[in-house]
Amino acid sequence: MLNAIRARRILPMEGHNTSSRTDSGYYSFPDVIEDGVIVHNSSTIVDVLSFNAFSKKYTLKAEDLGDVTLTPALINCHNHLELAHLKGKATFGEGFETWIDSALPHMATPVTALSLESAVSEMAKTGTAHIADVNGRAPKAVYDAVTAYNLSCHIQFEVFGYNFPNIAAGTLCPEDLFSSTAATLPNEAKKRWMTLSGHALYSTSPDALVVAKQWCRSHERYFSIHLSEHLGEDELLTKGTGRFREQLSRRVLPKDFTPPKMRAVPYAKHLGLLDESTLAVHCVHCTQEDINILQESGTTVCLCPRSNELIGVGTAPVRNFLEAGLQLTLGTDSLASNHDLNLWNEARYLRDNFDIPTGALLRMLTIAGAKALGITNELGTLSKGKRFHYAILPEDF
């Protein structure tokens, strides 16, 4: 059965270049359908057109949403929903080392159903349709909470640590990298939404990261990794010293750990982790050399600006990324390091602090995220055949 909704404006985001180069029109405001209509069958978009064209083509009555602007539904490219119960429990503003020390004692506690429901409800109400979720301990609970709101999510099983079966013998298998909790997921989720992500270069065996990336590449899944998030990371990797080194030595690093003596981005390149299907999360402390490496490899950067500010790790060089032509997406990160999971607030932060125009922000929130996660056949634009999901552009944009 066909239905239709009508809005004062529709921004389909269809046919727009996802490149961030200034000569690509990335900064320009996207094309607008004034007085537009979306025809749908409840699950799939059937048509997107002006009300005038709709009136001539269909006999349906369109539900009028009023003086609003519709955009494609938003894509949250980085989250940790299994930490939804940590809201307000970590220390902000004193740097990464202090933050992780304050959050770790709470991470052992399983996420509650109420916390998950509240987090997913907030994302649904603010226009998010898909979430790239880093997980390991509660994949089934997260998947059920997300699908209950008719949203979708990638479940990224996080590869963490140095102790893996057969790693010393050089025969580590990809299957060894998945948490045993993967078995709890329904087959549909395993086939469609399950992937691997590396925690970070400092916290994970390089051999395990390479195997994880190879698995993602061979299964045509994207690979995600926290990269260059804070200064302690680069000090550990380049010199093997610092407070962060001492912190990790108590919990994670093997006794024979030797730093690669490379910054995070060059080291990721050295390991073969960077390409068009890699999502590098944070990238706060990137030099021009780092930016060039990311651009040349085709790596997408996922910005989590409010999380970075709240923890106190610094601010990513967003303008430099844009000028270099990097594809940028947005994520909220978790409620352990953010006040909410509203992607519009991430966009507001970039607008207010970097003067990034609405057109560029909309691309980060929609089509760029869909491209990075490999779901442009379902989301990213308001187009015929895509899933019927939309967001309402806030009035201050």
Each language-model region and where it sits:
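Alpha-helical scaffold segments that flank or form the walls of functional sites
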Residues: 69-70, 87-151, 172-189
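Hydrophobic faces of well-ordered beta-strands that scaffold small-molecule active sites
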Residues: 75-77, 131-133, 153-157, 194-198, ...
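Active-site glycine- and acidic-residue-rich loops that bind
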Residues: 133-136, 197-213, 227, 309-312
